[in-house]
A protein has these predicted regions:
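Buried, small/hydrophobic-residue-enriched core segments of structured protein domains
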Residues: 10-361
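Generic structural motif
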Residues: 1-6
Length: 361
């Protein structure tokens, strides 16, 4: 609850953000009736959906394909809970869930009500939180470098999506929020995020509110390192947080602050595979697509990335679907875009094709 204090618009009157000043301390919060374990076990899928929509937590789910909030009354063939994160500078979900494992388990017990298929809990190395014994709930552990922690990678290997096969994804912190909603009657508005980047004096985990002002979060946090760029999200798939977009994204769990860069380092390739500095330097120039074998090296999915990128750039949606674009989101192509010497934004091309496919049916 709060008061709208600003409406920020971009080019062509595009709505960038609506700024809501939160209610003063001590004002009445929104509460729901807490349910016992027996009452939760007796819930139906429609009852669960109704409370999630009333609380605003229905928007925590996203569909694959297309990455949309599910339509009311729709049901997926599988649900994927993301409890691992391999993005640069990201927090360890095991630590976040370990702060309140009961809420996480309570939320997991409810998710099978929304699907007739399997609920996959995708974890990473070091996960030691106990899982509830629930029918159609399966823990799968992933390891390896990025993008091993992305939902698209998990779906590809466990239960691929496509035309007529829709899966939902949800973050582990949102599962904890669902657990608190039903077992305690609370509507959590907080989220644990990672503040990271060499421009910050104190990189750390921080509990804040969803949609928080990033300018306020980073007050007095900068080192004296020249120009910096602030991102909501990771350095690979986040967005620039400035002006009307200087707020924490709904699905972002980190804020990254990196040097603006722009300087070329003489013989920088001699540094080998040691520690490197994340900056905004492109180390390349805009040109036509260059089909390099490095795409296959960083793409764990069983697809042909160069052929797919070519189809996306020329807007050949039929060929793009045949090559697996319906399984993907922008974050799945972010690493390829980072490595591309032509500086091609494959994520934007993917989103354009997905929107066209969605419109055409």
């Amino acid at each position: 609850q709060g008061v709208i204090s600003a409406v920020n618009r971009g080019p062509r009157r595009r709505l960038d953000s609506v700024v809501v000043q939160s209610q003063p301390s001590g004002a009445e919060d929104v509460h729901f009736e807490p349910l016992s374990d027996e009452q939760q076990a007796a819930l139906g899928s429609d009852d669960l959906e109704h409370r999630l929509q009333r609380s605003g937590l229905w928007g925590a789910f996203r569909t694959r394909p297309f990455s949309r909030v599910p339509l009311s009354g729709s049901r997926p063939h599988a649900i994927f809970v993301t409890a691992t994160d391999t993005r640069p500078l990201a927090a360890d979900p095991a630590v976040i869930v370990g702060a309140d494992p009961g809420a996480f388990r309570s939320g997991l017990r409810l998710l099978p009500l929304l699907t007739s298929g399997t609920v996959y809990v995708c974890t990473g190395p070091g996960w030691n939180n106990e899982m509830p014994e629930v029918e159609r709930l399966t823990e799968v552990r992933f390891s390896g470098p990025h993008p091993a922690g992305l939902p698209g990678t998990h779906m590809h290997f466990l239960d691929p999506v496509g035309t007529g096969r829709v899966a939902w994804q949800i973050d582990c912190q949102d599962v904890m929020a669902i657990g608190k909603l039903f077992s305690r009657g609370e509507v959590p508005s907080s989220r644990v995020i990672a503040l990271g980047g060499e421009c910050l004096s104190r990189p750390r985990l921080l509990e804040t509110v969803m949609g928080a002002s990033i300018d306020e979060l980073l007050a007095d946090e900068f080192r004296q390192c020249g120009g910096c760029r602030t991102l909501s999200g990771s350095v690979l798939d986040g967005r620039r947080a400035s002006d009307g977009l200087a707020y924490l994204g709904r699905y972002h769990a980190q804020v990254s602050v990196i040097p603006e860069g722009g300087d070329r380092r003489l013989f920088g390739w001699l540094l080998g595979k040691g520690m490197r500095s994340w900056s905004t330097s492109q180390n390349g120039r805009y040109s036509g697509m260059i089909p390099l074998p490095v795409f296959e090296k960083v793409m764990p999915l069983d697809i042909l990335p160069a052929a797919l990128f070519r189809a996306l750039l020329v807007k050949d949606t039929d060929q793009a679907q045949a090559l697996g674009c319906l399984e993907l989101d922008e974050e799945d192509l972010a690493l390829c875009a980072y490595l591309c010497p032509a500086k091609t934004e494959y994520g934007q091309a993917l989103r354009s094709s997905l929107e066209q496919i969605e419109r055409d049916g």
